[in-house]
């Protein structure tokens, strides 16, 4: 590796926009490392980070209000290029001597920006740009040294630039896909104006992570709780590539997994990739602990506590393990930092998302803590993990523990596993699996009358759930074809003895959540 992948970096200051993480993901997509910090960061931290460019994000506040967030003055004294997006443009304008006013008419949705002049931010782009607006305030007077480089019918300063100082402001959101050439604009800023190179690639991330793991753990042994989920699977592959047999994975089968999932994990990581795996069959222990518990939160906590106990017992058997590997990813770090300090820039701090016991005297190895989920998946592919595993629908941490409503019983889990497997199999067969964002089956602990042959019988009910969403914050129920739903229902009722009725959940989020519990 000729260059350190962290040498060239962009700093994104977060003013609270729902799109801020998307800005960071786009910069990474371009091939440049970036970090996301709170707007009220100290000057010393920015100096230490030493960015090649700074992006000021959007945000929900109004620059015209007292005490609304401002960029640290050092941002404009540092001599590096600055791009202000939406609120970021407004605070840039106001802080550098321009004027912002509250507009009578909000601009929300698509808009056409007429580009004027020759600005580096619009290099190689046409004179009219389709963009996505979402703002109430607008810049009415630009600071000295700036020129107007874009306008819409209702927004006189849709983009402004001080080419000499390399300050740019856009009133729209280049990070969202609705802005047709938004990625090109961000490339113009990051690669052209800031002069960064594309050093941040899947191959270089893997190379860097492996080198850092080797340096961190030396000849010590490492233990990892392998769940078969995306994050822990990618951590397993990275750490194994770095230290080989000095990694031991502990796979706890809690009896709440999908059909044949336990065997699939062992086949893939043990047989195919040759990792050391200890499989703990803890189904009885989990089910015993869950007896009589029907409250979803209580079930979640119980499952978490039992997992910690089992993992702790296994780790104590591995006397030489000095390090614990975890699948913490960057959004976990941002969320944890923000909730603890209000500032999202403590990327180096330990963030024990696994909730493992405090008295585990081990160092933490967290090779994914700089990565977004889409980056984790990409490096998983590069490491040889199958696409179907990396891109399958989300599965909750407590597993079927929150998909069996009410009390958990082995009978219910077994019925649900088989019904869910049929639903997922049919989605794949009909080429619908990748057209929905998440699909699963829920077990309802109610009996319903059914007719089989000449007899009536009372059996259980399951609900199918499929949603379409971009961010999982809001979701629409998926309009699956009636014929398809009919086929799934027939198969489940005929093939899973004990289920007599199948329903389809047509609730959106909000008001409903995606999972039932």
UniProtKB/Swiss-Prot annotation:
Domain of life from the UniProt record: Bacteria
GO annotation, cellular component aspect: cytosol
Protein's organism: Vibrio vulnificus (strain CMCP6)
Entry keyword set: ATP-binding, Glutamine amidotransferase, GMP biosynthesis, Ligase, Nucleotide-binding, Purine biosynthesis
Record-linked PROSITE patterns: GATASE_TYPE_1, GMPS_ATP_PPASE
HAMAP family in UniProt: GMP_synthase
MF annotations from Gene Ontology: ATP binding; GMP synthase activity
Pathway it works in: Purine metabolism; GMP biosynthesis; GMP from XMP (L-Gln route): step 1/1
Protein's name in the database: GMP synthase [glutamine-hydrolyzing]
Listed InterPro entries: Class_I_gatase-like, GATASE, GMP_synth_C, GMP_synth_GATase, GMP_synthase, GMPS_ATP_PPase_dom, NAD/GMP_synthase, Rossmann-like_a/b/a_fold
Glutamine amidotransferase type-1 domain sequence ranges: 9-199
Keyword field contains ATP-binding: yes
């Amino acid at each position: 590796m000729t260059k350190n992948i962290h040498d060239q970096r962009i700093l994104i200051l977060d003013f609270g926009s729902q799109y801020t993480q998307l800005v960071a993901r786009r910069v990474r997509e371009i091939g440049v490392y970036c970090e996301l910090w709170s707007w009220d960061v100290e000057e010393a931290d920015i100096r230490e980070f030493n960015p090649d460019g700074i992006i000021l994000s959007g945000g929900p506040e109004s620059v015209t209000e007292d005490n609304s967030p401002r960029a640290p003055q050092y941002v404009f004294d540092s001599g590096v290029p600055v791009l202000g997006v939406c609120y970021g443009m407004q605070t840039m304008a106001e802080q550098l001597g321009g004027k912002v006013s509250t507009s009578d008419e909000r601009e929300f949705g698509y808009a056409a920006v007429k580009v004027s002049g020759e600005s580096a931010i619009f290099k190689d782009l046409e004179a009219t740009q389709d963009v996505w607006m979402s703002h109430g305030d607008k810049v009415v007077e630009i600071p000295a040294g700036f020129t107007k480089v874009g306008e819409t019918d209702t927004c006189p300063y849709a983009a402004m630039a001080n080419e000499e100082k390399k300050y740019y402001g856009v009133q729209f959101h280049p990070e969202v896909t609705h802005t047709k050439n938004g990625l090109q604009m961000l490339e113009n800023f990051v690669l052209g104006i800031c002069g960064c190179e594309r050093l941040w690639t899947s191959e270089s991330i893997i190379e860097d992570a492996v080198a850092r793991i080797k340096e961190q753990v030396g000849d010590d042994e490492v233990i990892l709780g392998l769940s078969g989920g995306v994050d822990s699977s990618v951590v397993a592959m990275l750490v194994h590539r770095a230290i080989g047999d000095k990694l031991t994975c502990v796979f706890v089968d809690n009896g709440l997994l999908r059909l044949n999932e336990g065997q699939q994990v062992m086949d893939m990581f043990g047989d195919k990739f040759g990792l050391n795996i200890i499989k703990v069959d803890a189904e009885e222990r989990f089910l015993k602990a869950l007896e009589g518990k029907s409250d979803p939160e209580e079930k979640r906590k119980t499952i978490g506590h039992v997992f910690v106990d089992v993992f702790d017992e296994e780790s104590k058997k591995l006397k030489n393990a000095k390090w614990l590997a975890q699948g913490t990813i960057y959004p976990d770090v941002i969320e944890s930092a923000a909730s603890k300090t209000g500032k999202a820039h403590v990327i180096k701090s330990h963030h024990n998302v696994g909730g493992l016991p405090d008295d585990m005297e081990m160092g933490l190895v967290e090779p994914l803590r700089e990565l977004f989920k889409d980056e984790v998946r990409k490096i998983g592919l590069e490491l040889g993990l199958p696409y179907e595993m990396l891109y399958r629908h989300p599965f909750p941490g407590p597993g079927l523990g929150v998909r069996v409503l009410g009390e958990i019983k082995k009978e219910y889990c077994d019925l649900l596993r088989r019904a869910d497997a049929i639903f997922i199999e049919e989605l794949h067969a009909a080429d619908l699996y990748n057209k929905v964002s998440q699909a699963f089956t829920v077990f309802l602990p109610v009996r319903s009358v059914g007719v089989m042959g000449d007899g009536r019988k009372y059996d259980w009910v399951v609900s199918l759930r499929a949603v379409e969403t971009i961010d999982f914050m809001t979701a629409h129920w998926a309009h699956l074809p009636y014929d398809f739903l009919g086929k799934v229902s027939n198969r489940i009722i005929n093939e899973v003895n004990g289920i007599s009725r199948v329903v389809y959940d047509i609730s959106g989020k909000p008001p409903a959540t995606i999972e039932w519990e």
